[in-house]
A protein has these predicted regions:
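Bacterial Sec-dependent N-terminal signal peptides
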Residues: 15-39
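Surface-exposed helix/loop patches within compact recognition domains
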Residues: 57-143
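A short, compositionally biased
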Residues: 36-41, 69-72
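Short, isolated positions in well-ordered beta-strands
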Residues: 52-53
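C-terminal or internal capping secondary-structure element at the end of a domain, subdomain, or sheet
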Residues: 133-176
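Sec-dependent bacterial lipoprotein signal peptides
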Residues: 1-17
Length: 176
């Protein structure tokens, strides 16, 4: 009987031990999706050192690559709510055809350029010559409408704060 009581006490103590229930990785980069190239519709980056993933809900992740009036336009955006504010990160081209295996400088928003985008509520800002970055297209499949790549950039917001977007990756199916 005494052995049974000891065993019950040990089992009770062990069952009360608190294993961390949250298995979310603590390293922000480990929270990002893997860099795939199969059209998984994934997007992630580090925004000022914190993991940025599209938020739950409709219209939080969108990708288009279109040929309009003789020119190509690429647009990728991801949005999420942070502290009750809508925050968006994205990439795009204006009258610029993208190609697999090519790296593009993210600079000012004008014809022939690739740009990075940061949005906070109603304000949208784009990369510039003084706050720039790069986007690399690692896969472009026009038959399956898949575009994948990596990116990083610095961007200044409407208040003059410079945000660092790092370790960005995307694997999207795009609409035309």
């Amino acid at each position: 009987m005494k052995k049974t009581m000891h065993l019950l006490v040990i089992l009770l103590v062990l069952s009360c031990c608190n294993k961390k229930d949250d298995d979310t990785p603590v390293n922000p980069i480990d929270q990002l999706p893997p860099a795939t190239q199969t059209g998984e519709n994934t997007f992630g980056c580090l925004l000022d050192g914190e993991a940025f993933l599209p938020g739950p809900g409709p219209l939080t992740l969108d990708c288009v690559y279109q040929f309009v009036s003789g020119d190509y336009y690429f647009a990728l955006k991801a949005d999420k709510e942070i502290n009750l504010n809508l925050v968006g990160v994205g990439l795009g081209t204006q009258k610029l055809q993208i190609e697999e295996g090519k790296t593009y400088e993210l600079e000012e928003l004008h014809d022939g350029n690739a740009v990075g985008r940061y949005a906070f509520e109603i304000f949208t800002n784009y990369t510039s010559t003084s706050h720039s970055g790069e986007m690399s297209i690692t896969k472009l499949d026009m038959e399956k409408n898949i575009v994948s790549g990596t990116f990083w950039y610095d961007i200044e917001d409407q208040d003059g704060n410079v945000h660092q977007i790092r370790e960005g990756r995307f694997d999207m199916t795009f609409s035309e």
